[in-house]
């Protein structure tokens, strides 16, 4: 297959899936891993894809994309993460569910539970959770965003009145030094309130968050008890070895 045709196919496959690993591209195009890596490097230099650890993503996945787009990106990985989180939450527990498509996936995975008490600033998650009549769902007040997130000073004040068992926290980016980053200062204030009001904080993040850049600092990975993700750079693995934060991969392994 000519290189130009192969590049077109790679771009199309990545756009359709949001993210594909090197191994998946090798299988789809029937070429060597070395060839795929060279192709990905060329396409990344042209800004036609976004190079990631072990694969490639659509360029738009590196930005704070629209809600519908973000929900589609890495949906399989988000669902796998959500299933692992759900295993840790017992029936009758109390928890916060944060803004974001991965916390929303967790909400969906919890529908088989009973008698959960949930506080959320995620309108989409609340809409899902109301299907279970045994749940006690409380919505935080504040300013409603177009993506269904609720933020603002009123949201922070409301969340700070609670002390719950778990906080399901999303994040926009995780820096190489373990810093937790987001795009919106007001959203970060809400996330801080969730961490402070939770006995255990469960951070949920697909692997693309390790290559994204955001400017507002929330804190450190060491501020949360668990990190649930699909894949993680070796530098973060080494960082977590010095912390109490447990790393849970979407395949269920704990490191």
Swiss-Prot record:
Gene Ontology process terms (BP): glycerol metabolic process; regulation of DNA-templated transcription
Keywords recorded for this protein, A-Z: DNA-binding, Glycerol metabolism, Repressor, Transcription, Transcription regulation
Domain of life: Bacteria
Domain (HTH deoR-type) ranges: 3-58
InterPro entries per record: Carb_Metab_HTH_regulators, DeoR-like_C, DeoR_HTH, NagB/RpiA_transferase-like, Tscrpt_reg_HTH_DeoR_CS, WH-like_DNA-bd_sf, WH_DNA-bd_sf
GO molecular function: cis-regulatory region sequence-specific DNA binding; ligand-modulated transcription factor activity
Gene3D superfamilies listed in its UniProt record: 4-hydroxybutyrate coenzyme like domains (3.30.750.70), Winged helix-like DNA-binding domain superfamily/Winged helix DNA-binding domain (1.10.10.10)
Record Pfam families: DeoRC (PF00455), HTH_DeoR (PF08220)
Record flagged with keyword Nucleotidyltransferase: no
Record flagged with keyword Transcription regulation: yes
DNA-binding feature ranges: 20-39
PROSITE patterns recorded: HTH_DEOR_1, HTH_DEOR_2
PANTHER family hit by this protein: GLYCEROL-3-PHOSPHATE REGULON REPRESSOR, HTH-TYPE TRANSCRIPTIONAL REGULATOR SRLR-RELATED
Function statement: Repressor of the glycerol-3-phosphate regulon.
NCBIfam families: PRK10906.1
Protein name per UniProt: Glycerol-3-phosphate regulon repressor
Organism name: Haemophilus influenzae (strain ATCC 51907 / DSM 11121 / KW20 / Rd)
Gene: glpR
């Amino acid at each position: 297959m000519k290189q130009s045709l192969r590049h077109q196919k790679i771009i199309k496959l990545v756009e359709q899936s949001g993210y594909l690993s090197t191994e998946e591209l090798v299988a789809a195009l029937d070429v060597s891993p070395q060839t795929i890596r060279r192709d990905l490097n060329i396409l990344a230099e042209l800004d036609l894809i976004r190079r990631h650890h072990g694969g490639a993503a659509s360029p738009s996945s590196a930005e704070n994309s629209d809600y519908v787009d973000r929900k589609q990106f890495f949906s399989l990985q988000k669902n796998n993460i959500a299933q692992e989180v759900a295993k840790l939450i017992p029936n009758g527990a109390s928890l916060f569910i944060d803004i974001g498509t991965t916390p929303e996936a967790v909400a969906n995975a919890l529908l088989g539970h009973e008698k959960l008490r949930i506080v959320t600033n995620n309108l989409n998650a609340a809409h899902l959770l109301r299907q279970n009549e045994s749940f006690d769902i409380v919505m935080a007040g504040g300013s409603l965003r177009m993506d269904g997130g609720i933020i603002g000073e009123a949201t922070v004040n409301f969340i700070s009145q609670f002390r719950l068992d778990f906080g399901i926290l999303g994040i926009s980016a995780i820096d190489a030094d373990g810093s937790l980053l987001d795009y919106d200062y007001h959203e970060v204030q809400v996330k801080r309130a969730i961490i402070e009001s939770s006995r255990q904080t469960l951070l949920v993040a697909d692997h693309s968050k390790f290559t994204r850049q955001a400017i507002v600092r929330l804190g450190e990975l060491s501020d949360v008890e668990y990190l649930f993700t699909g894949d993680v750079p070796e530098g973060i693995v080494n960082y977590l070895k010095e912390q109490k934060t447990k790393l849970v991969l979407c395949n269920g392994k704990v490191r």
